[in-house]
Amino acid sequence: MEVHNNTYTLTRCKFIVNPNGEILTNKNIVIQNGVIKDVGDEIEGDEVDCRKYIVLPGLVNAHTHSPMVVLRGYYDDAELNEWLSKMWEFERNMSKDLMKLGSEISILEMLSQGTTAFIDMYFNPEDVKELSEKYKIRAFAGYTFLDELFDAYEIDKLQRALRESEYFKPIVNVHSLYANSIKTILLAKQLAEERKTWIHIHVSETRKELYEIKRRTGLFPVEYMNSIGLLNENTQLVHLGWVASWEIELIKKANSKVTYCPTSNMKLATGGAFPLEDMIKNEITVTIGTDGAASNNSLDLFREMKNGVLLQRQMYWNTRVKALDLLRLATINGYKLIGIKGGKIKPNNVADLVLINSELVYPLYKERLISHIVYYITSEYVEKTIVNGVINDKKRLRDILREKVKRLYDKLNS
């Protein structure tokens, strides 16, 4: 981990890529106190030679379950409801130590892959807070309202004691409409309002869920959320594979945020079709997430961007969703969701950046870079990740990761 004194410069960056399609060549990025001060020809402070690097804004994993790396490969090749029952069965007896180790491994993995911020839904936000400060990654997490496993009032009490720190911010996690009573959902809503944060919830993931909520309430899931005042600018809706056109209008009107998890949805055979083009046309803030390592297996946002484009083309029989759209989801839209000035490399934005080794990318042409980033490059091409001006080298992170993975193996086989 390199922490430079106050000011340093990434010099002679081979390419600087922004999510509006702008690409700069052989320019410098001056960073001061964790913020981008200048992009151009200026040099201040220490110099970091970046002549071999493609520099991107940091990537935001807008939906994951960090401890579930422990369950990677545990129960694959099952549909969502069967898979969930197996996960909950394991999670009832999952030790706190194992949860924390799982979160630590996921954080090391994500940080080494270019993820600079992540939104976590699980049961150990205090661990995530501690680890985010230790490794310098932005984390947004909270205790999860889930009637199947926890008492809602106990979750409310725990959440109220959770405090913000430099790299961590509490959010309110609600597993889903179908896994919670209306009493629990309204308790979570009140909590989010009082704590001035947002609600992060799985919605309209499967046809079964849609039918169940319709049977229970007479409304489709997003309609129902709107009817109880749960649909607003502080709501993050995850999945939405089964959403009606009039519900998209409700999301737009409420200014709610949305998260697309293409790989997980395909793997769990949830069906439906996430209407990305319609969301973009309606100027809805759409972000992208890997989901957990138990349902995706990978936490690589480069893979996720590629799968995000390909799924749209397969489902809708057109190429109207472009590579650049997915880059926006992972960068500038992610930062809009978390409420931080970032996702674009420009003065006054946070210095959250990804450095890719251009020597591994070929044929290397400026006009092909956006295509390469989404369709060709994977996280293996990432060499450094910068968060809040702190430089993390992949090799160092991977050395720590190997040690933690050995501990995990020993725990699972003891």
Question: Which role does the model predict for each range below?
Answer:
Residues 127-241:
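Metal-coordinating catalytic core of metallo-dependent amide/deamination hydrolases
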Residues 1-42:
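N-terminal metal-binding scaffold of metallo-dependent hydrolase/deaminase domains
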Residues 227-234, 276-359, 377:
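His/Asp/Glu-enriched, well-ordered alpha-helical/loop segment
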